[in-house]
Each structure stands twice: as C-alpha cells, then as structure tokens.
Amino acid sequence: GAILPLEQLLQQVLQRYPGSKLLEAELEEKHDVYVYEVELLTSAGIVREIKLDASDGRLLKDEEDD
C-alpha cells in the first residue's frame, strides 16, 4: 500500500517533543509492513526511539534508547 511522507510524520513526532533534534530517520520494511524508525534527542538530553506505521502514522513504539 501507500506510505505517508516522512516529513508529515516527523512534524507529528516533533510536536510530541518540542525542542528536540532529529538524529536519524529510516524506513524499514518487514513482511510487507513499512515502519519509520526515528531517533530524537529531546531538550532534556534523552535519546528516544520512536517507531511509526508508515501507512497510517500510528505510533508503534516510543521509548528511551540506551
């Protein structure tokens, strides 16, 4: 199926963590499911790993990255 543009989903993620910086973003595909994996450095200095469903923008994972 179609996937949403990364830029659109990044805005959603950056609104969740204002003042954060994007470290890395990549599109992954497993079993015909596309997932954006995004790493952010929050304003508090914490790295967060966020996974979004690329087809509908659903948040799949949001946790501190060690």
Language model features: what each stretch is:
Residues 57-66:
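Short, low-complexity, Pro/Ser/Thr/Gly-rich segments in the mature regions of secreted, periplasmic
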Residues 1-21:
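Short, non-transmembrane alpha-helical segments in secretory-pathway proteins
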Residues 22-52, 58-59:
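Exposed beta-strand-loop-beta-strand "reactive/processing" segments of non-cytosolic proteins
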